[in-house]
């Protein structure tokens, strides 16, 4: 909705400043590395930080790239180094514990945001958390456990939205859960 603002760090600053001035709760911002290139990534991130955002997430692709190509680790590392007052969350191509580890340990982000990979592996959050809490890398789930997750998702969604809607929604997700990464 606001990707065009990636061309104008001053606009980002003024909009974030205006929003934070009327909120009494934390505001987080997620942005891409840029519109068609990442030349303004650091400036955009610093604009949001100086305007009072509580945390910043950045997807390592430009708006033009959408979901093609690869996450721009170099740009995320530059932004991570520049952002010093708030948590910086890296996003893009986090499909495994090793991807999360690389972002945190090598790029210097404070946290990671998992996106599309969770559609194939909802267990990824448990795997990443366990690794950072204990150093243990959990193996891929066996098929029966994946089936349990799909069934639990169906039950919970049914409780929330009703059986008919839940079945329709889980029908598209269950094959991805069972197939895995």
Model region roles, listed by residue range:
Residues 4, 29-41:
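Active-site mouth loops of central-metabolism enzymes
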Residues 10, 14-17, 22-24, 38-55, ...:
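Alpha/beta catalytic cores of nucleotide-metabolism and tRNA/nucleoside-modifying enzymes
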Residues 29-33, 60, 90-92, 116:
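A cross-domain feature marking catalytic cores of carbohydrate-active enzymes
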Residues 1-7, 58-68:
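Glycine-rich, proline-tolerant flexible connector loops at the mouths of alpha/beta enzymes
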């Amino acid at each position: 909705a606001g990707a065009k603002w990636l061309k104008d760090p001053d606009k980002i600053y003024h909009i974030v400043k205006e929003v934070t001035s009327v909120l009494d709760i934390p505001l987080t911002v997620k942005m891409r590395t840029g519109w068609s290139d990442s030349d303004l990534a650091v400036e955009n991130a610093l604009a949001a930080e100086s305007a009072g955002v509580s945390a910043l997430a950045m997807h390592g692709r430009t708006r033009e790239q959408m979901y093609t190509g690869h996450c721009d680790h170099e740009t995320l590392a530059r932004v991570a180094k520049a952002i010093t007052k708030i948590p910086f969350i890296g996003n893009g191509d986090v499909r495994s514990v090793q991807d999360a580890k690389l972002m945190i340990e090598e790029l210097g982000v404070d946290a990671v945001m998992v996106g599309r990979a969770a559609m194939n592996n909802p267990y990824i959050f448990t795997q990443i958390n366990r690794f950072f809490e204990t150093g243990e890398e959990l193996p891929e789930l066996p098929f029966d456990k994946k089936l349990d997750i799909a069934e639990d998702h169906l039950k919970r969604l049914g409780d929330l939205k009703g059986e008919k809607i839940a079945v329709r929604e889980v029908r598209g997700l269950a094959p991805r859960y069972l197939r895995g990464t």
